[in-house]
Amino acid sequence: MAPAADMTSLPLGVKVEDPPFGKPAGGGGGQTPSTTAATAAAMGADAEGAKPKVSPSLLPFSVEALMADHRKPGAKKSVLAASEGAQAAGGSAKPLGARPGSLAAPDAPSSPRPLGHFSVGGLLKLPEDALVKAESPEKPERTPWMQNPRFSPPPSRRLSPPACTLRKHKTNRKPRTPFTTAQLLALERKFRQKQYLSIAERAEFSSSLSLTETQVKIWFQNRRAKAKRLQEAELEKLKMAAKPMLPPATFGLSFPLGGPAAVAAPAGASLYGASGPFQRAALPVAPVGLYTAHVGYSMYHLT
């Protein structure tokens, strides 16, 4: 009888829990809670056995992988090994967050992503003939928007060197008369004697020099114009020499200022005259002139 009492005490020691949806423990069609838990465990084991077993792996860009890199020194190698194992188990499956083709298996065929012409991969993938063509001095290919005349620069215009503009002579101009030395000396001697010749004198003088009257007349006209230019230049030189280097009010006086009245003015007299309100200031001037006079003038004393 003692064993029976022990057997009846075992079920009483099991803790009975309510089901998750509020059903009573004893309302399961006559099944006990222990049999229900055993059945669920068996079904879960069958489902897990049907699925392929995949080792838990960390994604290379997940938070756990990044945190593991800082915590453990060898975590990076384990993460890479786990990612390779996941790729081998999943076949063509790619890790989330990774760029296509970056971490794929080398023997797994994958469609390459089209690369731009200016990216590093595009430059490395370009064939040699394309590189040679780009470096060739031929005209480069332009995109349609560059071919638009609004955006394309204007064609460079070659500027021709400016032509030397020469003075155009008259078509019916007579050639210049080549005078000899004897003729030039005779013409100069005659010009010093008389600048204007009469018709008879010109005819006689031209016949003596074996020249025409027109040649003698033109030579005298040119010689008179030259003499006039020389005379004007000489007068300009004389004017420049007569002008003082500095203003005359500072260094010289061309006429005496202040007569006897200015000399006899008292020392305490006002500088402004009393004749009117608009009278200019009259400074007393000494009777002796300044010693620095104009150029060409000698020193003098006022008496």
Curated annotation (Swiss-Prot):
Example GO BP: positive regulation of odontogenesis
Keyword Ubl conjugation: yes
Chain segments carrying region Disordered: 1-55, 74-113, 135-161
Protein's UniProt keywords contain Ubl conjugation: yes
GO MF term (any one): transcription cis-regulatory region binding
DNA-binding interval(s): 172-231
Pfam families documented for this protein: Homeodomain
Keywords assigned: Developmental protein, DNA-binding, Homeobox, Isopeptide bond, Nucleus, Repressor, Transcription, Transcription regulation, Ubl conjugation
Glycyl lysine isopeptide (Lys-Gly) (interchain with G-Cter in SUMO) cross-link site: K15, K133
Low complexity bias spans: 32-47, 81-93
Subcellular location: Nucleus
Primary subcellular site in the record, as a coarse category: nucleus
InterPro entries: HD (IPR001356), HD_metazoa (IPR020479), Homeobox_CS (IPR017970), Homeodomain-like_sf (IPR009057), Msh_Homeobox_Regulators (IPR050674)
CDD domains recorded: homeodomain
A GO cellular component annotation in the UniProt record: nuclear periphery
Post-translational modification: Sumoylated by PIAS1, desumoylated by SENP1. Sumoylation of Lys-15 and Lys-133 not required for interaction with H1-5, transcriptional repression, inhibition of myoblast differentiation, or binding to gene promoters.
Top-rank taxon, per record: Eukaryota
Family stated for the protein in its record: Belongs to the Msh homeobox family.
Function recorded in the entry: Acts as a transcriptional repressor. Capable of transcription autoinactivation. Binds to the consensus sequence 5'-C/GTAAT-3' in downstream activin regulatory elements (DARE) in the gene promoter, thereby repressing the transcription of CGA/alpha-GSU and GNRHR. Represses transcription of myoblast differentiation factors. Binds to core enhancer regions in target gene promoters of myoblast differentiation factors with binding specificity facilitated by interaction with PIAS1.
Subunit structure: Interacts with CREBBP/CBP, TBP and SP1; interaction with these transcription activators may inhibit autoinactivation. Interacts (via C-terminus) with PIAS1 (via N-terminus); the interaction is required for the localization of both proteins to the nuclear periphery and specific binding of MSX1 to the core enhancer region in target gene promoters. Interacts with H1-5.
Protein name per Swiss-Prot or TrEMBL: Homeobox protein MSX-1
Source organism of this protein record: Bos taurus (Bovine)
Protein encoded by which gene: MSX1
